[in-house]
């Protein structure tokens, strides 16, 4: 699947940009976007009661924006590997573009989409910079595991830091195992 050429490079760059920006820079832009003092943030809060800055939702938004490029790149690569003749066959059989996408392209791309999802989750798990900028570090409300580790290390509480580090190591190992399974499954199918 290819976007019209004037827009594909722009959209690709926009969706990949958070991968190359320092997380604090991405967090700064997210803070500007979602602040109640700015148009979009004010609109969300006034009309829907949605507060992103210094909230759990801010943690989710920051982690999603920072990790999205990994998902996007994997999905895009998986979509490009779908044999074009299968898409043409679907068109010949009268399938709509929507049906072709959901019944041919997505199922054949599933391993790549899954591995992108796993990598995105792993990246989101370790997110610190953008989350700190957008959601803050409010204990019990917006503090992530990475922020918690940094906080207890400032207090030289090595036992608590060690506990959280072990949690992250176990989660990361599990995520990498899932990723490995997905990539091996994809190679096995070819």
Predicted segments with their positions:
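Membrane-helix interface segments
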Residues: 3-11, 39-40, 55, 85, ...
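Membrane-interfacial helix termini and adjacent extracytoplasmic/periplasmic loops
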Residues: 27-64, 135-138
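C-terminal transmembrane helix and the adjacent membrane-cytosol boundary/short C-terminal tail
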Residues: 7, 69, 76-92, 158, ...
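Short amphipathic alpha-helical coupling elements at transmembrane boundaries
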Residues: 9-12, 16, 42-46, 77, ...
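Transmembrane-helix boundary motif in ABC transporter permease subunits
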Residues: 1-15, 28-32, 78-80, 86, ...
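Small-residue faces within membrane-embedded alpha-helices
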Residues: 12, 16, 20, 27, ...
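Interhelical loop and adjacent transmembrane-helix boundary motif
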Residues: 133-173, 177
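Transmembrane alpha-helices
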Residues: 72-75, 79, 83, 97-130
């Amino acid at each position: 699947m290819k976007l019209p050429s004037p827009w594909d490079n722009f959209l690709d760059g926009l969706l990949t940009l958070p991968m190359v920006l320092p997380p604090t820079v991405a967090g700064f832009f997210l803070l500007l976007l979602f602040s109640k003092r700015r148009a979009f943030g004010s609109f969300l809060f006034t009309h829907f009661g949605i507060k992103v800055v210094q909230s759990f939702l801010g943690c989710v938004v920051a982690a999603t924006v920072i990790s999205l490029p990994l998902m996007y790149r994997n999905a895009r690569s998986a979509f490009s590997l779908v044999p074009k003749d299968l898409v043409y066959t679907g068109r010949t059989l009268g399938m709509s573009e929507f049906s072709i996408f959901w019944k041919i392209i997505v199922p054949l791309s599933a391993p790549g989409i899954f591995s992108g999802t796993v990598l995105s989750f792993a990246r989101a798990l370790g997110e610190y910079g953008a989350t700190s900028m957008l959601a803050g570090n409010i204990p019990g409300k917006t503090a992530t595991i990475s922020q918690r580790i940094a906080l207890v290390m400032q207090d030289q509480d090595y036992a608590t830091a060690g506990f959280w580090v072990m949690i992250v190591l176990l989660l990361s190992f599990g995520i990498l195992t899932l990723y490995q399974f997905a990539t091996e499954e994809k190679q096995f199918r070819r």
